[in-house]
């Protein structure tokens, strides 16, 4: 005979897979053209010079060089640029 009563069911117990978002190459790091710099949802960071934006807002290098993060404009937006070496 069972010494424990049957447990009830639950509607919890699920979680989504982590999306691995965030900065992949930091300021001052050397990158090659095509390297992913930031994976993001929306435009937390905006594309500066020598940086392209994918349709999922991923920022990537369009030229070889060093990564530079800067805040500029009236709205204090964060821009990511590549400074060619």
UniProtKB/Swiss-Prot annotation:
GO cellular component terms given for this protein: cytosolic large ribosomal subunit
Annotated S-S bridges: none
Keyword Ribosomal protein: yes
SUPFAM superfamilies: Ribosomal L27 protein-like (SSF110324)
Keyword Electron transport belongs to the record: no
Domain of life: Bacteria
Any one Gene Ontology molecular-function term assigned to this protein's record: structural constituent of ribosome
Keyword line: Ribonucleoprotein, Ribosomal protein
Xref: Gene3D superfamilies: 2.40.50.100
Gene Ontology biological-process entries: translation
InterPro entries, sorted: Ribosomal_bL27, Ribosomal_bL27_CS
Region feature Disordered, mapped onto this chain: 1-20
Annotated family: Belongs to the bacterial ribosomal protein bL27 family.
The name this protein goes by in its record: Large ribosomal subunit protein bL27
Source organism per UniProt: Pasteurella multocida (strain Pm70)
